[in-house]
Amino acid sequence: MHIFDELKERGLIFQTTDEEALRKALEEGQVSYYTGYDPTADSLHLGHLVAILTSRRLQLAGHKPYALVGGATGLIGDPSFKDAERSLQTKDTVDGWVKSIQGQLSRFLDFENGENKAVMVNNYDWFGSISFIDFLRDIGKYFTVNYMMSKESVKKRIETGISYTEFAYQIMQGYDFFVLNQDHNVTLQIGGSDQWGNMTAGTELLRRKADKTGHVITVPLITDATGKKFGKSEGNAVWLNPEKTSPYEMYQFWMNVMDADAVRFLKIFTFLSLDEIEDIRKQFEAAPHERLAQKVLAREVVTLVHGEEAYKEALNITEQLFAGNIKNLSVKELKQGLRGVPNYQVQADEHNNIVELLVSSGIVNSKRQAREDVQNGAIYVNGDRIQDLDYVLSDADKLENELTVIRRGKKKYFVLTY
């Protein structure tokens, strides 16, 4: 299957410039292309993964990727479809984020092997030395204000106000494309659908300044079946950095995907063949309660992002927590699996009677409720049911001398730390 057709079949093409010309270019030989990532945080997230994996698919088809991390544009801030001006970060902060993102990208693209090995670039390398006068004379003169104002990303900000700094962002992104074309013969840019205006600024600059044709592919912004986006600005980002989103949390994210999204996400986020995905779809639709599509999705993406061992650990944590087998997990695994649950620091002189602790830790509101819960068998300490009102937590209940896990009912977990 032609790589363009595969991308379409997987739902990875939202918009392109000249589809016929782009198809022809991809058929005739190796195409050099780039995707840009602005360092707006110290980690990329699942929203970025769509473009990253699209870039990897093109590399596997024999084309050459350039991964641009925006050390310069990250200092400015992209206004595209944002309601307000971004907060400007210091150069030291942005430089640190650049290094983090470059490290993450190296997990997905092959930077070492073959004539189409990926190349990492930073646009601070060319913007850091250009003077303001040169910027206006050599770049700015190719963009009319009318053209810049016509971009949807700018139109949406005109009424609320947009600074010249952010207004000029599209010129900077356009110049990225121009530089990569001149230095590396890059003729294709890949990015999110919200970047269309900035990306076509690059094709316009190429046409006007160098009389060359550039191509653009935008990938869709991913939403669930209800139309809800996931990403940093929506406050529900699933980060690629395991310190920000653990492999277990990422595993749970995919396991909780709605049935209506599961097969579509298999096409977008995994390298399973379309035939394999079709087989999974048939099995999934025959027995949706078994959640086969979600299980495969969780396995494939967690393994892709964090490695097979992290996937196995996430699966084990899931199975042990579901069964209530707390003692089968290490403290490291428990911290990963119970991140975000209520945590209470037990004081050295605090009475460790179970009823007293249930109240002082905030697990229940009163001693009466605590006594009822214990007597009714609703309280578990490290997976063991406690029904003795006089039970006192001892050192034996401190897992690795660090924490105790309390469960109330079937699913409400609490962690006591010492």
Swiss-Prot record:
Enumerate the spans annotated as S4 RNA-binding domain: 352-418
Q: Record's Pfam families?
A: SYY_C-terminal, tRNA-synt_1b
Q: What UniProt keywords are attached to this protein's entry?
A: Aminoacyl-tRNA synthetase, ATP-binding, Cytoplasm, Ligase, Nucleotide-binding, Protein biosynthesis, RNA-binding
> Which InterPro entries does the UniProt entry name for this protein?
aa-tRNA-synth_I_CS, aa-tRNA-synth_Ic, Rossmann-like_a/b/a_fold, S4_RNA-bd, S4_RNA-bd_sf, SYY-like_C, Tyr-tRNA-ligase, Tyr-tRNA-ligase_bac-type
Show the SMART domains listed in the entry.
S4
Q: Which domain of life does the protein's organism represent?
A: Bacteria
GO BP annotations of the record are: tyrosyl-tRNA aminoacylation
Instruction: Quote the record's binding site residues for L-tyrosine.
Output: Y34, Y169, Q173
**What CDD domains does this protein's entry cite?**
S4, TyrRS_core
Where's it found, cell-wise? Cytoplasm
Query: What Gene Ontology cellular-component terms does the record carry?
Result: cytosol
Listed binding positions for ATP are K232
Q: Where is this motif: 'KMSKS' region?
A: 229-233
User: Subunit info?
Assistant: Homodimer.
Query: By its UniProt entry, which HAMAP family does this protein fall under?
Result: Tyr_tRNA_synth_type1 (MF_02006)
What family is reported? Belongs to the class-I aminoacyl-tRNA synthetase family. TyrS type 1 subfamily.
What name does this protein carry?
A: Tyrosine--tRNA ligase
Q: Which organism is it from?
A: Streptococcus pneumoniae (strain Hungary19A-6)
Q: Please state the gene responsible for encoding this protein.
A: tyrS
